[in-house]
Each structure stands twice: as C-alpha cells, then as structure tokens.
C-alpha cells in the first residue's frame, strides 16, 4: 500500500562543517522514536569511523521518521543527510534534487560561512522551501539576532519564523519537527499509474547484499521482483529487496511516488550505479530520463606508492575494495624510477584525496608516499588534437605543443575583516583575479577566480593560518584558460627525477625551483664526490645548489719533506673524484623523497 503523498515530507539539512547538522539529525531520530535511547550514539548517520572523527559527512545517508503532528495526523519524514564539503558537491546536488525542502542550520555563535552559502544556493536552484534553524543558542557566545540579520542580508531569506534550538541538549527540536510539517511542501508531482521513474540518489557496497541503492520514486511503483533498467548505462537488474531506513534497514512491500527508500538487485559494483541516474521498469519504461545526470569526473591527480615495494599487491587489492564503494575514485598502475611501482589516482578534490589516503593507511595498514597533487591540463597540439595531461612526467615534447590550458575555479572566502589584507595578499600571490568584495557586518566576503593548480598545493592551510582559523573557503569549478605554463624538472647529478617534475607558471618557476633545490640539499646525504642539484625548464637551468664532497685527508701520512709529494697525492685524489662523479650513482634515500614531496604540498 502506497502512502498518500500529502503526508510525506522529503527534506535535507544544509549547513557548514561543524554547525551541528549530524547532531540535529540524531535528535530528530531520537524524538520520533527511530532508535531506542540505548541504541543512540553520536552522529548515527555518519557510518564511517573517519566521518565521525573528522566530524564530516562523506556519503549521503537517509532515514525515514514517523511523526505525529499537533494536528493529530501522522507524517512520514524522509531526511537525507548530505555531505557538506565542496569535493562532494555533485552528491549534494543529487541529494537536494530528491527533496522539496531544506533545513538551513546556522551556528548562532559563528554566523553564515562560505559553504553554507554554496549549499543554500544549490537548494534554491532546486526550488526548495527553506526553514531557518539557529543552532547552539545555549552557548555564551551565541548572538541569534545578529545572525538572523546576517542571513537576511547575505542570503535574502526571511528569518521571522526562524527556529532557535540547541541540538546538543534537545532544546527547541520539537519546534523543528512542527516546522517541517507546516512550512515544507509535500512532493509536488507523482502518479501511481504512470510507468516507474525513480532517481538514484546514492549507492554503497555491502559485503552480504552487494550494492545497496538509495532511490527516490517520482512516478509509478517500485516493488520486489520487477526487472529495472538504469537509463544512463542501460544495465538491467531484478529487484531482490525493497525497504526503508529507520535508520535500521526494514523491508517493505513497495515504494510509491514521493517515497525514499533502498533496493538491492545483485549489483556487483558501485561503478554500475551512477548517482543521478534514472531507474525505470524494463517491461514498461518511462519516456524520458531525469535532467542533470553527469558521471563524476576526477579533478585532482596524484601518485600513491607503497613505501615497501612488497606491499604493491596489497595496495592494489585495497584500492579495488575502496572503489567498490566510491565510483568517483579512479586509479591506474604507474612506475617511477625513483619510487618504484605504484598508482596514479584521480580524486574529486583535496579532501577526497586525504580521505582515500587515510582510509588506505588506516583500514588496510599500508604505509604510502603521495606525490605532489596535480590537476588535469589540456594540451593543444600543433596537429590540431587536444591531449589531457594527468602526470607532468608524461608531458609531450614542447615543440609539438601550441598552447597549454589549466582549470580555474571561482572561490568564495569569508573572513573577519581584520584578516582581509592577508587574505587578499595570498590570493594575489596565487595569481588570483578579484571578482567582488562585500561586507556582512564585521565579516568580509571575497570572490576570486584562481587557477586550481595554485589551490591544490597548500592554499587551504595557508588561508587557515593567516586568518587564525577563522576564514572559510568554498569553490566551484569554472573552465579552462590558457596559461604560460612550463615543465620544471629536478636534476640530481645530471639525472632527472621523475617524481619531482611539475608544471608551474613561468613567473613562479624560479622561486619554487630554488626552494625545492635548497630542501633537497639538506635532505640528500653527502657522497665522496660533489653533487649538483638543479631545477631546469627544458635545457635552461633556473636554480642550482651543490652538495659538497666528503673530504678524506690523503696527505696525513706525509711528514715535512717535499711539497711536490703532497701535490701529487692531491692531484691523484682529484682525478679519482672526477671519475667517481662520472660513474658514481647518487643514492637518494626514501625519506628525502617523502620530505621533499611534503614541502611541495
């Protein structure tokens, strides 16, 4: 039996990191009896350890709550807990498209942050109704009235009916439930008699059930035994289970229009189920797919190598397992003269890269070296073709390239105005172009266009340190722009080190080359002969440092006597060193690479 859609509310919670989104979700689950008090734990919906520890949500989770409103009716509330971080922006947009309304949660002591803005605009793009919720009003530093003004100024939505709560203590949470029922709309469309049309909101891998697919039914009915087809990939599957999360998995007979639940259908890999795809019935398909579907594209690339070469097969198996659950993570085998066998991996952004690396190290006990992150460059060749470059070491011959394009982003930075000067200086230093600057109370909101290449190194860390942690940062991908980019190679004793080559803008090549040479000079141990360390662009050396040779005192055995005897011994030593330098190999310790690559970040 399907539920009357007038009694369904599908909503998500939009907030900046740490503004209390997952804690509010916990309280809603507790107050509607989704879990017993003894079963409650912090951040119920964040199932990965790393999500709980970093206090971030990575995968979208869902829960179905039954709420008896003050008017005596029982409503079904479907909450989709979305990721808040920019790397997962596409997952956020699909989760929002599955809902009709959002709770905008803002920390009453901190106010509007950059990611709040980005996610609010996405919610508005999906024509959501918004309920403003001010969280943490019990804190001594809370200023609800100031924050309400700020929300009206920056976002332009009415805050007269804003709900003031403390998700931690439970204060005011019942008012949030009432606001969801009275202020948010029910699903706008949906016809039981039309062919099945459902949106694939998210999917994850379960060792026993295979891939679990989170769906939002638009039209028709989804039930066990149907043969379904993914319209994006054309793959067909028989539905084995249909159910909902409360947040425990509970099987139901069917899901009707407006409902959100899960299905399993012997799907082997998450890569077969693309977020945003349309699911329909094979026997009687719907006419057109839902708009807005696009496969995830990696944005940042880096090499991951095991410190111990014997771990290579374990690393491959571990990456295969992670890919089961994360279709946006891609990898291929790569060899490096300096680091041995490893993988070239593609990620959605820097947080995604950190999370994958941390999960590999933590869940699979692997010790890894990550090479400097790089972005995807486009090479326009003289013969008219366009090549994508993921690894600077693979750059084609410069003579064949007519121009190089790099990806740019539009960054929104919110900072207290006393740090504004330092923030603007940092953006200028990174080749940024200012788009706008506005003030919201004592905070400044700056919009900059920046090359992604300059952001993937250490932009975020630098921004946090110059603003004492108060600035927040969010970005959207823009498009590719032509730039004066050159490949910088590092030569040690005349041999190029592939793991350290990088594409840089010509204006900062010398500065970056010099700092890297200085670092390597301190990291590579002395040999019996002198070692030059050089940074080069093509055949031109732009920076050089020299590691001096170890000196053995060959004249120690001579006492007094003729000076020519000493000179002869010194000349002989000089000849030997010359020969050694010609044939000797420089041993670069692994630790030097790790340190040098850290410096690169």
Swiss-Prot record:
Residues 6-188 form the tr-type G domain. It is found in: Cell inner membrane. It is an enzyme of class 3 (hydrolase). Pfam families: EFG_C (PF00679), GTP_EFTU (PF00009), GTP_EFTU_D2 (PF03144), LepA_C (PF06421). It catalyses: GTP + H2O = GDP + phosphate + H(+). Its EC number is 3.6.5.n1. One of its GO terms (biological process) is positive regulation of translation. It is a peripheral membrane protein. Keywords: Cell inner membrane, Cell membrane, GTP-binding, Hydrolase, Membrane, Nucleotide-binding, Protein biosynthesis. Signal peptide: none annotated. GO terms for molecular function: GTP binding; GTPase activity; guanosine tetraphosphate binding; ribosome binding; translation elongation factor activity. GTP binds at residues 18-23, 135-138. GO terms for cellular component: plasma membrane. SUPFAM superfamilies: EF-G C-terminal domain-like, P-loop containing nucleoside triphosphate hydrolases. Required for accurate and efficient protein synthesis under certain stress conditions. May act as a fidelity factor of the translation reaction, by catalyzing a one-codon backward translocation of tRNAs on improperly translocated ribosomes. Back-translocation proceeds from a post-translocation (POST) complex to a pre-translocation (PRE) complex, thus giving elongation factor G a second chance to translocate the tRNAs correctly. Binds to ribosomes in a GTP-dependent manner. PANTHER family: TRANSLATION FACTOR GUF1 HOMOLOG, CHLOROPLASTIC, TRANSLATION FACTOR GUF1-RELATED. This is Elongation factor 4. It comes from Bartonella henselae (strain ATCC 49882 / DSM 28221 / CCUG 30454 / Houston 1). The gene is lepA.
């Amino acid at each position: 039996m399907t539920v009357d859609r007038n009694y369904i509310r599908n909503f998500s919670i939009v907030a900046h990191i740490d503004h209390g989104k997952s804690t509010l979700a916990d309280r809603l689950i507790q107050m509607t009896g989704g879990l017993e008090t003894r079963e409650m734990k912090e951040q119920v919906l964040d199932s990965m350890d790393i999500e709980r520890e970093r206090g971030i949500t990575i995968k979208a989770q869902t829960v179905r709550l039954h709420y008896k409103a003050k008017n005596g009716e029982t409503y079904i509330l479907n909450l989709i807990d979305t990721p808040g971080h920019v790397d997962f922006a596409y997952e956020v947009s699909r989760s929002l498209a599955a809902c009709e309304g959002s709770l905008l949660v803002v920390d009453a002591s901190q106010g509007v942050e950059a990611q709040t803005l980005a996610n609010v605009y996405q919610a508005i793009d999906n024509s959501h109704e918004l309920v403003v919720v001010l969280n943490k009003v019990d804190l001594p530093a809370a200023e609800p009235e100031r924050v309400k003004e700020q929300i009206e100024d920056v976002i332009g939505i009415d805050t007269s009916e804003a709900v003031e709560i403390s998700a931690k203590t439970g204060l005011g949470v019942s008012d949030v439930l009432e606001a969801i029922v009275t202020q948010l709309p029910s699903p706008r469309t949906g016809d039981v008699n039309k062919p099945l049309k459902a949106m694939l909101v998210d999917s994850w891998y379960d060792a026993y059930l295979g891939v679990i697919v989170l769906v939002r039914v638009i039209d028709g009915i989804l039930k066990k035994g149907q043969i379904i087809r993914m319209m994006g990939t054309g793959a067909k599957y028989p539905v084995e289970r249909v159910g909902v999360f409360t947040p425990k998995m509970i099987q139901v007979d069917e899901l009707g229009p407006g409902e959100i639940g899960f299905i399993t259908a012997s799907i082997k890999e998450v890569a077969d189920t693309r977020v945003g795809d349309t699911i329909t019935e094979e026997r009687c398909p719907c006419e057109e797919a839902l708009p807005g579907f696009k496969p995830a594209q990696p944005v940042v690339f880096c090499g991951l190598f095991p410190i111990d070469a014997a771990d290579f097969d374990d690393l491959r198996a571990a990456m295969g397992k992670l890919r089961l659950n994360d279709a946006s993570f891609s990898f291929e085998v790569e060899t490096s003269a300096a680091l041995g066998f490893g993988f070239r991996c593609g990620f959605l952004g820097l947080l995604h890269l950190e999370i994958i690396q941390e999960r590999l190290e933590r869940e699979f006990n692997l010790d890894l070296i990550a090479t400097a992150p790089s972005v995807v460059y486009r090479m326009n060749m003289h013969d008219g073709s366009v090549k994508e470059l993921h690894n600077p070491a693979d750059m084609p011959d410069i003579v064949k390239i007519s121009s190089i394009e790099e990806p740019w982003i539009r960054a929104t930075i919110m900072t207290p105005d006393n740090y504004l000067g330092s923030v603007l200086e940092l953006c200028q230093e990174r080749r940024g172009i200012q788009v706008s600057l506005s003030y919201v109370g004592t905070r400044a909101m700056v919009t900059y266009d920046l090359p992604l290449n300059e952001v993937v190194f250490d932009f975020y860390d630098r921004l946090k340190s110059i603003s004492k942690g108060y600035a927040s940062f969010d970005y959207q991908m823009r498009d590719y722009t032509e730039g004066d980019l050159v490949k910088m190679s590092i030569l040690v004793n005349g041999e190029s080190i592939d793991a350290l080559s990088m594409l840089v803008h010509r204006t900062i090549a010398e500065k970056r080359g010099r700092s890297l040479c200085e670092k390597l000079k301190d990291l590579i141990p002395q040999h019996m002969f002198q070692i030059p360390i050089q940074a080069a662009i093509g055949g031109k050396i732009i920076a050089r440092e020299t590691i001096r040779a170890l000196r053995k005192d060959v004249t120690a055995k001579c006492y007094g006597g003729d000076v020519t005897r000493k000179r002869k011994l010194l000349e002989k030593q000089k000849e030997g060193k010359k020969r050694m330098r010609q044939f000797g190999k420089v041993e670069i310790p692994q630790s030097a690479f790790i340190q040098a690559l850290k410096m690169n970040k």
